[in-house]
Amino acid sequence: IQFSFGSKTALVLHHTPMIKASARANLSLVREVDASITDQDIDLALKQVGLNELAQSPAHKLSAGERQKLCLARAILQKPNLVLLDEPTANLDPNTTEQVEEMIRQFDQSDADLLFSSHQLAQVQRLAEYILFIDHGEIKEKGPVGPFFLNPQTAAAKRYLQQELIAE
């Protein structure tokens, strides 16, 4: 994994603060970083995440899933090289989780690299190609997702997978 600190990075958190203004106004804040963003760009980003009907709704009153989609719209506007997603579907219902995962897959089709954290093993299998398994703040294992799940190499990874798979 290579990353240049000069690259454009978008951050999508599962608890992102919103200003007490419309969803559209929250996206307009991206103009402070990139003045080339137009009203049409904002409208397109809202449409891409399915929030065009809620553009004038107060962002702080949107549901958790709608707020997450708004965060993804913000990332779309930034045209980043790298998107960091922290637990992108935490606390979302299954339908909204599926919608957000589809949006993440669309990002994956762009030139942006995606790096996401997740404790949801099924989501990791659906979305990731490569895994860094971290235990107590230390990378214990890294490599393609398939082999990690089929044949974990470290005791920590084996223990975690056994606990999680039994719990699921």
Task: Tell me what each language-model feature is.
Residues D39-L54:
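Conserved ABC ATPase "signature" region
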Residues S118-H119:
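H-loop/switch region of ABC-family ATPase nucleotide-binding domains
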Residues V83-D86:
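Catalytic Walker B motif of ABC-type/P-loop ATPase nucleotide-binding domains
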Residues V124-R126:
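A short, surface-exposed alpha-helical micro-motif characterized by mixed small hydrophobic
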Residues P58-L62, E66:
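Conserved ABC ATPase signature
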Residues P94-N95:
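Helix N-cap at the start of a conserved alpha-helix in ABC-type nucleotide-binding domains
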